[in-house]
Structure formats: structure tokens, C-alpha cells
């Protein structure tokens, strides 16, 4: 039997995932982070993107979209505190495309009243959601 580590993914609203994983891959600030059982302790921010969780006895990875948050790793426990977390199969492609379009328009029509950082963050989240949807499609087709 493969070694496993307990992983919890929670958002402000609910617990999205709680269980054993063989490996977990996160969208880190400086690139992807792959966490295996008995990993050295770590505390870092994660950026908007897809978390991939390899659950024992499942051939496919569980995919969870996060809008950013914190990742804490202990040798026997992984905890993700996400601003927003949604299972990839629950993402709404039409809503993500609309959010991307709104953010791109806001960035293109810059004026003094616009919050540039908020528009950039909304665009990054929409793009990350669309990437999660595409990754899910690739795994299910």
C-alpha cells in the first residue's frame, strides 16, 4: 500500500475535501508545489489555480479550484485555508468567461476611479477557473 498523508481543503464557507492522499499538488507563488507524505514543515501562500489530489485507489486526481489562500504542511497533515474553494466539476464556465470579459474590459478602459489591482485579481481568478475547467475536461475525455 502506498504511503499517504491526511489533507484538508477548507474555504470560509465549507470543508471541500478531507481525506488521505498519496500526493497533493498546489499552485504556489513561485510555481507548483508537490507534497508527499512526511514532507518537511512548510507554510506558504498559494495563488489562484487548481489543486490536484491523488486519492488512494482512484486512477484520476481530484481537482479543486482555489482563489488563493494559505498552505500549511506538516509531516502527517496538509491543510489548505482557501479564500474560495470549488470542486472543479462544480465550476461554471459561462460565469468564468463573463468574469474574464468584465475584468479585461475594466483593464482596457482604465480611469482614475478603477481599482486596477482588483480588476487584475478578478482576471487572474477567472483565468484560473477556466484552466481548472479545461484540466477537468482533459481528465474526463
From Swiss-Prot:
Q: Name one Pfam family in it.
A: ATP-synt_DE
UniProtKB keywords: ATP synthesis, Cell inner membrane, Cell membrane, CF(1), Hydrogen ion transport, Ion transport, Membrane, Transport
Give compartment(s): Cell inner membrane
Q: Could you tell me the membrane topology recorded for this protein? A: Peripheral membrane protein
Q: Where is the signal peptide?
A: none
Q: Which GO terms describe its molecular function?
A: ATP binding; proton-transporting ATP synthase activity, rotational mechanism
Gene Ontology cellular component?
plasma membrane; proton-transporting ATP synthase complex
Q: Does the keyword DNA repair apply?
A: no
Q: Tell me the protein family, please.
A: Belongs to the ATPase epsilon chain family.
Q: Which HAMAP family does the record associate with it? A: ATP_synth_epsil_bac
Describe its partners and assembly state: F-type ATPases have 2 components, CF(1) - the catalytic core - and CF(0) - the membrane proton channel. CF(1) has five subunits: alpha(3), beta(3), gamma(1), delta(1), epsilon(1). CF(0) has three main subunits: a, b and c.
Give a short account of what the protein does.
Produces ATP from ADP in the presence of a proton gradient across the membrane.
PANTHER family named among the record's database cross-references: ATP SYNTHASE DELTA/EPSILON CHAIN, ATP SYNTHASE EPSILON CHAIN, CHLOROPLASTIC
Annotated protein name in UniProt: ATP synthase epsilon chain
Q: Which gene encodes it?
A: atpC
Amino acid at each position: 500500500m502506498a504511503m499517504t498523508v491526511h489533507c484538508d481543503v477548507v474555504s470560509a464557507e465549507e470543508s471541500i475535501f478531507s481525506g488521505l492522499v498519496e500526493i497533493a499538488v498546489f499552485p504556489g507563488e513561485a510555481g507548483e508545489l508537490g507534497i508527499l507524505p512526511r514532507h518537511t514543515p512548510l507554510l506558504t501562500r498559494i495563488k489562484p489555480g487548481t489543486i490536484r489530489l491523488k486519492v488512494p485507489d482512484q486512477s484520476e486526481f481530484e481537482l479543486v479550484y482555489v482563489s488563493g489562500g494559505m498552505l500549511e504542511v506538516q509531516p502527517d497533515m496538509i491543510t489548505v485555508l482557501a479564500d474560495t474553494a470549488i470542486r472543479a466539476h462544480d465550476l461554471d464556465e459561462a460565469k468564468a468567461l463573463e468574469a474574464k470579459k468584465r475584468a479585461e474590459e475594466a483593464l482596457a478602459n482604465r480611469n482614475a476611479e478603477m481599482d486596477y489591482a482588483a480588476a487584475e485579481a478578478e482576471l487572474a481568478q477567472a483565468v484560473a477557473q477556466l484552466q481548472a475547467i479545461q484540466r477537468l475536461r482533459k481528465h474526463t475525455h
